[in-house]
Amino acid sequence: MEFETHEDAYLFYKDYAKSVGFGTAKLSSRRSRASKEFIDAKFSCIRYGSKQQSDDAINPRASPKIGCKASMHVKRRPDGKWYVYSFVKEHNHDLLPEQAHYFRSHRNTELVKSNDSRLRRKKNTPLTDCKHLSAYHDLDFIDGYMRNQHDKGRRLVLDTGDAEILLEFLMRMQEENPKFFFAVDFSEDHLLRNVFWVDAKGIEDYKSFSDVVSFETSYFVSKYKVPLVLFVGVNHHVQPVLLGCGLLADDTVYTYVWLMQSWLVAMGGQKPKVMLTDQNNAIKAAIAAVLPETRHCYCLWHVLDQLPRNLDYWSMWQDTFMKKLFKCIYRSWSEEEFDRRWLKLIDKFHLRDVPWMRSLYEERKFWAPTFMRGITFAGLSMRCRSESVNSLFDRYVHPETSLKEFLEGYGLMLEDRYEEEAKADFDAWHEAPELKSPSPFEKQMLLVYSHEIFRRFQLEVLGAAACHLTKESEEGTTYSVKDFDDEQKYLVDWDEFKSDIYCSCRSFEYKGYLCRHAIVVLQMSGVFTIPINYVLQRWTNAARNRHQISRNLELVQSNIRRFNDLCRRAIILGEEGSLSQESYDIAMFAMKEAFKQCAVTINTIKHPARCEEAAIQAGDPVQEENQYGSTSTQIGPEPNIHAGNVPWQAETRREKRSSLNNTSKKAKHVAQSETVGEGSQEGFQHVADPRQSQAVLAGQFHNTMPGVFQNLINTNFQNIPATNMHQNNPPG
């Protein structure tokens, strides 16, 4: 391989490094004594070599060097061409291909150079005055916060002994279940700064319900004693599911970037389609940096809740203003109509010069429903988002709740949530909702939707009787629907060719199922089934197409849990057994034997005196013949049945049991992984098998080990310096 110049060689090595996942540095170069031209150059990984520092250094800085040998050595031939003299490929550390753009050597500053007058920020200029920093991958954004000593005193505020309590909690949870994930962040002074964790069931829930995630900071912003933030989703029973917890030191871009990165690693790199947050510039910058493909939306209820704090003379014209504002927000059919009404509104109430109103308009695509066509919030919008999120911890977290009390309540909260979901699953298996009309839409969705969603959809079907529609024009596809229930008119656009329907009430966007206005238009158009693209799988009984099964029999001690466990195993057995005639024969044989043994056991329990007779006369309820083919008579010994990596038989080893205290032992209902994860269980890094493709460990978000933890547990932290981005008002 040849290069025209040594700079071309370095660009090649940089491109290679970015694709593999490490940062680069120019290690050395040499010039000819005669011609003064470069004749030799060596490029390396940024972790090449070892740290050299004076013993009397006042403010020692962390160094990334850990003795890595990866490098490329190039030399110049007499004809002027450069060639590779030596190349070392192996690294002594993990590579980060997904996060490679964060390395200093891979950040593109061309946009800054070409647009210097708009993007360059003078020293001490507030970050809120900077613009055009949305393309974080292409700008030197993260390093733009400058490595300085601003974060030296920032740490997680804890009471005496809380650090040990927190560490013990994290290690116990991971000991109970190896798929429990956690990560910690330390300052350069070895102070505990940020903590993140998510339980095994939260990771499994995210696989099925990753479309919409709410990031909740109300406890943190309200200055609770426990600086708690939450990642929350919603399952197919419209129950909140906890997708991660964080304890944060401050409200800065750095903190939120670290948190989002840690959460993304825990979730195997799977990014949500939509993330709902409160209006916050630091969170906005972090999501744009870590989750650029995710649609970031503000909670509309939170936006409206800020009106009294940001507008003068609010009480003088509150009713009139809100009426006009709601008309603009909820009754604007198009983006142009929204803009027109907004400008008319701020002129009428003399709000053009109010900075908050200007910023609100500039960010209208983050919160205004008119700009969110095609997005589904799964019910996590408006006030119901706040109520759903707060319902997780409202019984366990109060302003003065200590960390110890919170961790104890955490186990109880998990137990409550798992019981509620198990009960809803049981109801779904055990009974069907009642039909309340002869509507074909109701019959269609009876066994498709989960019970809670069906009941809500059923109200829309019944409400269609109170709607009257008129066509806006003979040639058009837009209908005006008068809803006599709320005395409002709605516009419905129906494209029969594309099976695309849209209502101005935006029920589908907010809730994930069609409204009564859309239903009456479909009905009057001769369409009597809900178009498939408006039946979200997340709301159906098939939301989890492969159920997690508990291997520990101690987790299945009630009729409800036993019933759910057997039903889920039967589904997996059906999937595997139907793949071939041989697997079908094996499954049938196993079921026959199971029926016989169950009959004997039940008869023994009911009639102990006749147990021997019951064992002989127990019938076989399974038909002998396979209606799809012949059944083999030579089955052989009972096999071990597997579904993916899920063993059918219980593990022989005893799983270690522990709990936070005597009152939270039942928190062990966390769904157990069916694959033993790989990674350190002795330190702060663990990524299980399903997520190894990311090649990222939680420990990579750490810096150095504080003394308070060194005697408690063996750790293997890598000394990676943190980028200091401690500003809570980043460019927007």
From Swiss-Prot:
GO terms for cellular component: nucleus. Residues 624-635 have a biased composition (Polar residues). Residues 11-97 form the FAR1 domain. Residues 212-308 form the MULE domain. A zinc finger (SWIM-type) spans 490-526. It is found in: Nucleus. SMART domains: ZnF_PMZ. Residues 623-683 are annotated as: Disordered. Induction: Up-regulated in hypocotyls by far-red light treatment. One of its GO terms (molecular function) is zinc ion binding. Expressed in hypocotyls, rosette and cauline leaves, inflorescences stems, flowers and siliques. The keyword Metal-binding applies. It comes from the Eukaryota. Belongs to the FHY3/FAR1 family. Putative transcription activator involved in regulating light control of development. PANTHER family: PROTEIN FAR1-RELATED SEQUENCE 10-RELATED, PROTEIN FAR1-RELATED SEQUENCE 4. This is Protein FAR1-RELATED SEQUENCE 4.
